[in-house]
């Protein structure tokens, strides 16, 4: 995979797990008329609604089970909450993005049991797509609700904040491209809409062993197609996905 990282900006780092994909393959057969399993048995995604992401902020109401899934004992949640609140908008963004790899690794070291099923992923956006992020920020500004609550626009999302640092993604194991839909944050991936069926039928490519897209050209086609058919409200973008060891 010929990727020039200097052409990309980091959109943050997150901690997730593999997603068991049997039900999604069956759904694509039942609803999207797929004639074969198009995805591997387990996938990785930075935006799939069925994926689990490591909980960071208590005010987004994670369950105790969410912490346990990532090996965080209940007696450490209070310390994690204080740490995360201190770093909010400085090193960590809403809802689950670390601006830098070192902060994600600090989270893993301090609060988790470093279980082998955790996956530390980085998100990269090609600079040619930055204008779409700017348009999204302009189209979804912050506002004050009728109750007086301050509602952050897209510019206040962790994704947008990380991009404004203008840092290249850290070097790691490049897994491929995800295609994600942005509205308030990263709200969906192309798998939320079964678009692997269109990848095969319209664009003649299959997802790779991670459920991602192997090359930028196909990822661009899929993002533009999802935008064209308006499969979700929001802006569709192809993002580079890189995997890192949990510890340096």
For the regions a protein language model found, what residue spans apply to each?
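Short aromatic-glycine-(Arg/Gly/Cys) micro-motifs in beta-strand/loop hairpins
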Residues: 2-94, 109-131, 138-208, 232-243
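Acidic, proline/glycine-rich low-complexity IDRs
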Residues: 218-248
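Short amphipathic alpha-helices within nucleic acid-binding modules
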Residues: 100, 104-108, 215-223
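A short, highly charged, low-complexity intrinsically disordered segment
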Residues: 206, 213-216
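Extended amphipathic secondary-structure runs
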Residues: 98, 104, 116-118
């Amino acid at each position: 995979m010929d990727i020039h990282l200097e052409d990309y900006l980091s959109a943050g780092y997150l901690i997730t797990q593999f997603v068991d994909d049997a039900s999604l393959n069956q759904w694509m057969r039942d609803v999207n008329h797929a004639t074969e399993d198009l995805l591997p048995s387990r996938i990785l995604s930075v935006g799939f609604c069925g994926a689990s992401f490591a909980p960071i902020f208590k005010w987004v109401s994670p369950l105790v089970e969410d912490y346990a899934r990532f090996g965080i004992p209940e007696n450490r949640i209070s310390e994690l909450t204080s740490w995360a609140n201190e770093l909010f908008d400085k090193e960590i963004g809403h809802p689950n993005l670390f601006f830098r790899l070192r902060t994600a690794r600090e989270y893993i070291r301090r609060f988790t049991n470093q279980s082998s099923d955790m996956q530390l992923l980085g998100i990269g956006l090609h600079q040619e797509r930055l204008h779409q992020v700017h348009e999204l920020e302009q189209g979804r500004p912050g506002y004050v609700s009728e109750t007086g609550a301050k509602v952050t626009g897209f510019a206040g999302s962790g994704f947008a904040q990380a991009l404004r640092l203008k840092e290249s993604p850290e070097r790691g194991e490049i897994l491929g491209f995800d295609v994600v839909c942005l509205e308030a944050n990263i709200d969906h991936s192309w798998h939320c809409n079964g678009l692997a069926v269109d990848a095969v039928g319209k664009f003649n490519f299959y997802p790779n062993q991670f459920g991602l897209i192997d090359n930028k050209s196909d990822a661009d086609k899929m993002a533009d197609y999802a935008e064209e058919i308006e499969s979700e409200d929001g802006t569709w973008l192809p993002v580079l996905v890189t995997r890192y060891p949990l510890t340096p």
